[in-house]
Amino acid sequence: MMRLEKVFYLTNPTTKDLENFIDMYVFKYILILLARCKVFYEGRAKSQLEEGDRVIIIKPDGAFLIHKDKKREPVNWQPSGSSIIWEVEDNFFILKSIRRKPKEELKVVISEVYHACAFNCEDYEEINLRGSESEMAEMIFRNPDLIEEGFKPISREYQIPTGIVDILGKDKENKWVILELKRRRADLQAVSQLKRYVEYFKNKYGEDKVRGILVSPSLTTGAEKLLKEENLEFKRLNPPKGSKRDLKHNIKTKKTTVLDEWL
């Protein structure tokens, strides 16, 4: 995998490499795939797009777009808030974008990927009433007691083999604390992400040395159930209001993966 300052990419990845790549960056960065695929839509109607070269775009808010080599509009798309799932079946990489209300499913069967790109897009000119996960992280670094008394955040966007940890820190008992941040209602996929990160740290440091906390304004019923089953925690926290521009310099200075003093 090649890395630039804000861009991570793979050229002609294997199915396994692509699976790991999407697992690491989906819902965090903008994903762009240049791929050969078939597309199936089922919802208010049914449609099928035969195999061809397409540009697939998955945005952090769940928006899913498929472009051909002509025209401005995507040939298929799903709105923000859609769930994204993926699997490997008979050597095909399958992406699904699922919208629950109204019920719609966009299924992309990928036979070949020429290029996969993850772009860390930070648009500070945009004014949001609801802040991004980056702004949530900045807010937590400024006031760690929002999570709990004695919490010490150490690193943001800490990369491990199973993904990118939003915030890594320690509690007052010196246990590792992994925070998964969601600016909207957290679903099953958010819990699954957190579970993978916690399992990695438990394998490294021990079962009783690691905690995982999902931080978001609310939870789906399924997410709440899975959190309890996996002995993970939930902290209700709304993202900050205001301009991303105001936090531009603070956000950049807080990003670090230097943990030598803690490890």
Curated annotation (Swiss-Prot):
Q: What class of enzyme is it?
A: hydrolase
Any single Gene Ontology cellular-component annotation: cytoplasm
Alphabetized GO MF terms: DNA binding; single-stranded DNA endodeoxyribonuclease activity
Alphabetically ordered keywords of this record: Cytoplasm, DNA-binding, Endonuclease, Hydrolase, Nuclease
EC no.?
3.1.-.-
* Principal cellular location given in the protein's record: cytoplasm
Any idea where this protein resides?
Cytoplasm
Cytoplasm among keywords: yes
Matching entries from Gene3D superfamilies are given as:
2.70.180.20, 3.40.1350.10
The keyword Aminoacyl-tRNA synthetase appears for this protein:
no
- Per the record, a Pfam family? NucS_C
Q: What does this protein do?
A: Cleaves both 3' and 5' ssDNA extremities of branched DNA structures.
For this chain, the family text in UniProt reads: Belongs to the NucS endonuclease family.
HAMAP family given in the database record: NucS
Q: Know the name of this protein?
A: Endonuclease NucS
Recorded source organism is Methanocaldococcus jannaschii (strain ATCC 43067 / DSM 2661 / JAL-1 / JCM 10045 / NBRC 100440)
Q: Which gene encodes it?
A: nucS
